[in-house]
């Protein structure tokens, strides 16, 4: 038993010979990266996103002459209800917006997206907290629920669906359109600072739990922003010193770390993703075209909205990288400007981001 052979002391005492900053032997390993890899850490803007297109290609990214702004097509957002994402009528609606309105929708979406009078889009409200809606802007009464790790221990998708339904009911009562949850990163160590937000160390269990919660939430008209995409397994230096860099093989990334997000989208209908502040390899996750567009949008067929709350980098080159990767919303209450909103590539990708925002606001009507 734990009481034999000093078991209690071993279980509760301080480990010997372990450095606070080292590995279990107390040693601190040193790794040296190549000059080529080091140079990649210095990339900024469009180039850092690894978007495979050429931002100077005028045929792909025309200038002002390639777009219409402020058109009078007599359409409102409500007229789009029930239309497919690729319905050509969306272009007529998007033609009614001004470039400045598109820019603001993209870069000023803290705790919800702005109203757009020209197309009759109302303001929306979105809140944080993985175990209930942390509504701090109104007097609405909402509830807190057991943590994800506890509910995962039930091994019950029925429990998770009830959980999602309950939070969905709270959303209706509190006029909430978006929820920055559930948290679906993988437990890598018992010392993980946010383990209580995440379900388990198993990708399938985590994915099935999250999918059931998302299905319940989305059925009530609120959007789940599953987080943190992706490989957010440490909070130390996650946003400091250039951000912690997490490394993994493609097989491990797909089979373990991406799997819960795939389940949540394809089985649970999740319409939102909140990104991490870390890097995967050398690249910021909030500015990774391979992750955000090649996998989620192109492979999984997802038309939902990304949001990043790493606002300290969302000015100029940081915002450029995010938009070029496929980003949609910046969680900021102060404007975070692109370096050149009038450039051809910014015009086209802003239009696509706004298309996603407007589509999301109608998908459950």
Please place each PLM-identified region on the residue numbering.
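Glycoside hydrolase catalytic-domain context in secreted enzymes
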Residues: 1-363
């Amino acid at each position: 038993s734990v009481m034999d052979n000093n078991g209690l002391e071993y279980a509760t005492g301080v480990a010997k010979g372990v450095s606070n900053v080292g590995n279990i032997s107390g040693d601190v390993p040193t790794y040296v990266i190549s000059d080529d890899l080091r140079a990649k850490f210095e990339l900024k803007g469009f180039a850092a996103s690894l978007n495979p297109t050429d931002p100077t290609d005028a045929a792909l990214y025309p200038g002002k002459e390639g777009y219409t702004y402020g058109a009078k097509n007599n359409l409102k957002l409500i007229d789009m209800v029930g239309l497919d994402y690729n319905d050509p009528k969306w272009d007529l609606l998007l033609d009614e917006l001004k470039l400045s309105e598109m820019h603001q929708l993209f870069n000023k979406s803290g705790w919800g997206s702005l109203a757009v009078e020209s197309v009759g889009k109302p303001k929306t409200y979105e809140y944080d907290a993985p175990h209930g809606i942390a509504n701090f802007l109104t007097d609405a009464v909402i509830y807190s629920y057991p943590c994800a790790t506890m509910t995962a221990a039930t091994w019950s998708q029925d429990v998770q669906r009830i959980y999602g339904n309950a939070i969905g009911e709270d959303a209706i009562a509190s006029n909430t359109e978006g929820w920055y949850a559930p948290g679906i990163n993988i437990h890598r160590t018992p010392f993980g600072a946010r383990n209580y937000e995440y379900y388990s160390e198993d990708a399938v269990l985590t994915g099935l739990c999250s999918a059931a919660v998302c299905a319940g939430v989305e059925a009530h008209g609120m959007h789940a922003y599953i987080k943190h995409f992706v490989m957010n397994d440490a909070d130390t230096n996650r946003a400091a010193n250039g951000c912690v860099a997490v490394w993994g093989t493609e097989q491990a990334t797909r089979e373990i770390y991406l799997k819960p997000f795939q389940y949540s989208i394809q089985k649970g209908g999740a319409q939102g993703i909140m990104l991490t502040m870390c890097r995967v390899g050398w690249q910021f996750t909030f500015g990774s075209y391979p992750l955000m567009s090649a996998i989620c949008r192109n492979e999984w067929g997802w038309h939902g909205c990304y949001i990043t709350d790493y606002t300290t980098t969302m000015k100029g080159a940081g915002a450029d990288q995010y938009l070029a990767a496929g980003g949609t919303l910046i969680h900021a209450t102060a404007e975070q400007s692109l370096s050149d909103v009038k450039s051809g590539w910014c015009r086209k990708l802003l239009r696509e981001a706004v298309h996603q925002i407007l589509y999301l606001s109608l998908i459950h009507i």
